[in-house]
């Protein structure tokens, strides 16, 4: 059985848009660049040709990866999860015990994780600890050096 890719509907929609862009925009652009580079003649010392071929390989690899993620996407349905329970697709807000600054993240599948946008992978150490916990729970979150104790203050 193939590996499934748990994700939100939003994550799946973004992958579909990325795939469309790769196939309808990026792929034709790089094919055109290869044609232009070929017209320069000798390919053995043609850096533009080599760069375009490298980009083509990257694009084709990404298309394959995205198609696989879409094919085996498992959309998360939180209807059966308690409203105050941390789960994939939900936003969780917590505060380090003894501090006042809150941190909020959405827990998403690995395919859509982007920590800079506040989206952390369900496979990350912090998400693994938080998933299944509820508002008011106090948990120890592993850090590269040591750990921190946090209290879950909000789940939505």
From Swiss-Prot:
Disulfide-bonded cysteines: none
One Pfam family named in its UniProt record: GreA_GreB_N
Keyword Transcription: yes
GO process annotations (BP): DNA-templated transcription elongation; regulation of DNA-templated transcription elongation
SUPFAM superfamilies associated with the record: FKBP-like, GreA transcript cleavage protein, N-terminal domain
Gene3D superfamilies, per the entry: Transcription elongation factor, GreA/GreB, C-terminal domain, Transcription elongation factor, GreA/GreB, N-terminal domain
Residue ranges of the TM segments: none
UniProt KW keywords: Coiled coil, DNA-binding, Transcription, Transcription regulation
GO molecular function: DNA binding; RNA polymerase binding
InterPro entries from the UniProt entry: GreA/GreB_C_sf, TF_GreA/GreB_CS, Tscrpt_elong_fac_GreA, Tscrpt_elong_fac_GreA/B, Tscrpt_elong_fac_GreA/B_C, Tscrpt_elong_fac_GreA/B_fam, Tscrpt_elong_fac_GreA/B_N, Tscrpt_elong_fac_GreA/B_N_sf
Coiled-coil annotated spans: 7-27
Transcription as UniProt keyword: yes
Homology family: Belongs to the GreA/GreB family.
Role noted for this protein: Necessary for efficient RNA polymerase transcription elongation past template-encoded arresting sites. The arresting sites in DNA have the property of trapping a certain fraction of elongating RNA polymerases that pass through, resulting in locked ternary complexes. Cleavage of the nascent transcript by cleavage factors such as GreA or GreB allows the resumption of elongation from the new 3'terminus. GreA releases sequences of 2 to 3 nucleotides.
Name of the molecule in the record: Transcription elongation factor GreA
UniProt gene name: greA
């Amino acid at each position: 059985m193939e590996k499934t890719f748990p994700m939100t509907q939003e994550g799946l929609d973004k992958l579909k848009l990325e795939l469309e862009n790769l196939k309808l925009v990026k792929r034709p652009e790089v094919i055109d660049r290869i044609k232009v580079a070929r017209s320069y003649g000798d390919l053995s010392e043609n850096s533009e040709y080599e760069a375009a071929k490298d980009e083509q390989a990257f694009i084709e690899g990404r298309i394959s990866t995205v198609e696989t993620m879409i094919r085996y996407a498992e959309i998360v349905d939180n209807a059966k999860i308690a409203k105050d329970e941390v789960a994939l697709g939900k936003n969780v807000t917590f505060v380090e015990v003894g501090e006042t600054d809150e941190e909020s993240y959405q827990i998403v599948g690995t395919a859509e994780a982007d920590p800079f946008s506040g989206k952390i992978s369900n496979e990350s150490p912090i998400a693994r600890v938080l998933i299944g916990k509820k508002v008011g729970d106090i948990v120890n979150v592993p850090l590269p050096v040591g750990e921190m104790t946090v209290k879950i203050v909000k789940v939505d």
